[in-house]
Curated annotation (Swiss-Prot):
The chain crosses the membrane at residues 28-48, 59-79, 112-132, 140-160, 165-185. It comes from Bacillus subtilis (strain 168). It is found in: Cell membrane. Keywords: Cell membrane, Membrane, Transmembrane, Transmembrane helix. This is Uncharacterized membrane protein YhjE. It is a multi-pass membrane protein. GO terms for cellular component: plasma membrane. Its main location: membrane.
Length: 207
């Protein structure tokens, strides 16, 4: 089964696959990352790799970035508009969410930019928490656009030549190492922000 799958991953088959995808036009390349912002279980990395291999590195990157950024902004605006209703009350009352809201409100751009730079950060949660917080719309848009710019470009650059990634073991190892480092650093940043928010909440409670 695995051998059959690998035998399909030739340059010719991959080119044909990506040409078929490209036939749908740039609209689908923007829509898929946009939809992922609402349905975070969808594979954003797969969409970005498909876009860069179908439309080229730069065009695929721009289309992916535009869709993902637009999706984050839409989620933020929807949550900002309807977040005070009872439907989202259980989210606002969750201790972890409240800690993140406190951190975002106090520090704004910086933490969100850092979190959104890393591919394995739950960006959907960041969008929702930002929408529930009192952070301004402009700082969020700036953080989302710049953070996604870094993150989407990293994915685009690593996954641009999918055939070479499969057939050249050294490049594959390097890509895996880079992804592992990004995951590790992202988790460290996420944990640091969580601890800092907990400390500030504790200090505030003692005053």
């Amino acid at each position: 089964m695995l051998e059959h799958f690998l035998s399909y991953l030739t340059q010719e088959h991959l080119t044909e696959l990506f040409q078929s995808y490209r036939a749908f036009g740039p609209l689908i390349a923007v829509l898929l990352p946009l939809i992922e912002a609402f349905l975070p279980f969808l594979p954003l990395i797969v969409f970005v790799v498909a876009n860069t291999n179908s439309f080229g590195l730069w065009e695929g990157f721009i289309l992916s970035w535009a869709g993902s950024t637009a999706g984050s902004i839409l989620v933020f605006l929807i949550v900002r508009q309807y977040g005070q209703r009872k439907l989202l009350g259980f989210i606002r009352s969750h201790p972890s969410v409240r800690k993140l809201m406190l951190w975002v409100e106090r520090h704004g751009f910086g933490p969100m930019f850092l979190l959104l730079c890393f591919p394995f950060t739950p960006s959907a949660a960041v969008n929702v928490v930002a929408g529930l917080s009192r952070i301004g719309t402009r700082p969020f848009i700036l953080a989302a656009a710049s953070g996604k710019l870094v993150m989407i470009f990293m994915i685009s650059f690593i996954g641009y030549d999918l055939h070479a990634l499969i057939t050249q073991p050294i490049r594959t190892v390097i890509a895996v190492l880079v992804i592992t480092v990004l995951w590790y650093v992202g988790k460290k940043v996420e944990r640091y922000l969580h601890v800092r928010a907990s400390q500030r909440e504790h200090d505030g409670g003692r005053q």
